[in-house]
Amino acid sequence: MEGLREARFPFSKLDENLICPIKTFAPEVREGSTVPTPVLFLQANFIRGGLLLTINAVHRTMDITGQVHMLSLLSKACRNVPFTDEEVTNGNLDRRNIIPLLDENWEADAQPPVIPKTTSTDTPSKQSAPPPQIGYAWAYFSFTSTSVAQLKAHATSSVTSPSAFVSSDDSLCALIWQSIARARLARLDPATASIFTRIVEIRQLFDIPKEFPGNIVTQTLNNSTLQDVTSQTIGDLASQLRSKLDPESLKHTFQANATRQARTKNKIIKPAAVDHSNFVMMSSWMKADCYDFDFNLGLGKPEAVRRPKFTPFPGAVFLSPRALDGEVVAGMCLREDEMEILKADEELLKYGQYIG
C-alpha cells in the first residue's frame, strides 16, 4: 500500500487481470440463455498494509450513476442502515416504461447520429517509412482543485461569446481534447478530422429519480479538424462542447433512438466502426460521490478511486470521481508516441501532473 501511495496509484500498478473479478471486455451473454447472469461483481484484494476493493458492473444494466448508487446501498447495508422507502421504490421502477416513446405519428426518417468513419492521413515525411509496430499506453494525469478552478477561470475569460457559460467539466474536457489533438499533429495532417464524443447522463430530462440504477446515458458528437481544435481558445472549445448539451435536443434524440429501437425486431446493436487514430471518447465521473463509502470495514474512507488498466482502448478518457480535497484524475489510453508528446505538453502541464 505504501508503494501504491508513493506512486499515486498509477495504471501501471492497477491491472484488471490481477485485481478484478471479471474483465472489462468480458464475453457477451448468448441470446436466449436461461442461466442467471450476475450484473455486479466485487473482489477484495488484500495487500500488505491495505485493501484494493474492485467493483465491476455490467454496463448494459447500469451507468456510473446507477453503479455509484448501488455502492451507496451496499455501504448502508454493511452498516446495518435500512434503505428508505424511496430508495426501494425508485430502485425497482419498471425499466420497460422508464423512457416515454414518441407517438405513432413520428417518422423515423432521420438516421441516428453515428461516429463518422474517417481515414487519417500521415504527414508526407512519414508516408515513405515502413509502418512501425504501434504500442498503446494507459496513463493518469492529476488536476488539483486549485488548477481546475484556474482552468475554468481561464476558459471563461477566453470565450469570445460574452454570455456563454462553461463548467469545470467543459473546461477540462476541452483542455484534454486540445492536448491530444496537438500530440496527433506530429503524425497527422492538420485537416484530419478529430472526433470527440462525450457521455451524458440524462435522468433529470425525464424526471427519473437518481435512485434508479439503469443505464440512462446518451452521447454527444463533436466533429472538427485537428487544425480547428488546436487553434481555438480553451474557452471557445469548451463552449462548443457545452452547446451540444441542449436539454431539448438531448431528450428528443434519446427518445427517437429508443422509439426506433422499440420498432426494430432485431434488438442487437452492433458497435460502429471507429478510426481510433483520431477519436476521443470522454466519460466524466467527476460528480460521482465515491469517497464517502467505508462499507463498515474499519479502514476509513478510500484513499483513491481509480479505473484499473484494461485492454487498450485508444482514445478512451475517464475523469475519475472528485477526491475529498477536490483533486480530479484523468485516465486515458493513447498510442505510446502520442503519450510521450502529451507528457511534455506545456499547456496541459500548466494545470495537470503526469502520474502514469
Language-model segments: which ranges?
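Non-catalytic N-terminal regions of enzymes
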Residues: 1-111, 153, 168-188, 281-356
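Short amphipathic alpha-helices and their capping loops
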Residues: 1, 87-156, 185, 194-206
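Residues that act as N-cap/strand-start positions at coil-to-secondary-structure junctions
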Residues: 36-38, 135, 276
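Intrinsically disordered, low-complexity regions enriched for glutamine and histidine
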Residues: 26, 57, 103, 125, ...
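A near-ubiquitous, low-amplitude feature marking generic local secondary-structure context
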Residues: 25, 57, 126, 130-134, ...
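Generic hydrophobic, helix-prone segments enriched in Leu/Val/Ile
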Residues: 54, 102, 115-118, 124-128, ...
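Acyl-CoA-dependent O-acyltransferases
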Residues: 138-140, 144-356
